[in-house]
Amino acid sequence: MIRIRWALVLAALAAPAFADAVRIGHLSLTKDPRYVQDWGYARLIAPPPVITSDAARIAVTDLQFTTDAAGLTVTLDARAVAEAELAATAQQMVATGASYLVLDLPGADVKAVADALKGQPALLVNATAPEDVLRSACYPGMVHSGPSQRRQMDAFAQYLRSMNWENVLVLVGEHPDDAGLADAFTASAERLRLTIVDRRPFTLVAAPQNREGNNIRLLTGDVDYDVVFVADTRGEFARYLPYAAQQPRPVIGSVGLTAGSWHWAFERDGATQVSSRFDKLTGRKIQSVDWDVWIAVKSLISGIINVPAATPVSVRAFLTSDKMKLDGSKGVTLNYRPWDGQLRQPILLATSDAVIMVAPVQGFTHQTNTLDTLGADEAEFACR
């Protein structure tokens, strides 16, 4: 640990000159529908409230040894506001000096904030919205620290291919996000020539006419498959699926084996220290969205320290360059892809209490960077 700290100090002292103070903003939504569980009647266990500004504060603290050595003071400006106030709040934060903003927002709100700040001197980090459409929008002042849907679905596809589970039954819920999740998985499956044997919608409405749409035995019958992929972003239906399908097959997607950027049970590459520190300081288990915010703040501080006379434009250029080498406690150095601003990172495939596989899966290679086997590669990417 002492050697690592001295290495950080030497790197900081060798870094080019920069402003002696910087303010990093963290903008989130009060009553974010992704974190608020309003279906208590369903007897779901409600987890502790997700407050990702905790992760932002921890990132600032984690790097304080380095920033102190470099003479940089980092201030965190964390705000949670109603949806109607997001655009104005973002503009006010930038106007008062927070030129670097980490966004913990749903996809539509990320777009609204990006549009409101168009032309402003700001660098936005979309930390938690996975929609691929945000990447293909190619906002010049934005990068994405959290993984895209396609990146996560590619991890599933690699794992299924490595296990020779080639035939997949896809079940899709009624929530608008469910269809997008199923579409992303289908694209990943097609990329690796997996077969979608059928795509079947399910419903939670318990009416006789919906019998085939809410009966698990019927939904999973009359077809052969190696695995079931379920797209159920709220989880009300999917929780009943494991051990109840017509055939004894694994379940992946929204339950069973899930994909994410982080898991508290990950034990390699210094991950236990990250998770334990978060648990101790917040009293809850770290989630993927927490890591996404933590690495976003860590990215920004690293960029600011390493760029002469740092500006949002020059910091983004550094983050998406080969010079950027970020430690995320995942065993490889991380940086952002220049064509879509997406953070290159491994994806963890995990159950509720164990990490089963880390993607890219061994055997999948790329001509320049193995991490680019996940997500839309440069040759297939286009701004839209």
For each feature predicted by the language model, list its residue ranges.
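Repetitive helical segments and hydrophobic/amphipathic motifs
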Residues: 12-14
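Extracytosolic ligand-binding ectodomains
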Residues: 2-9, 19-384
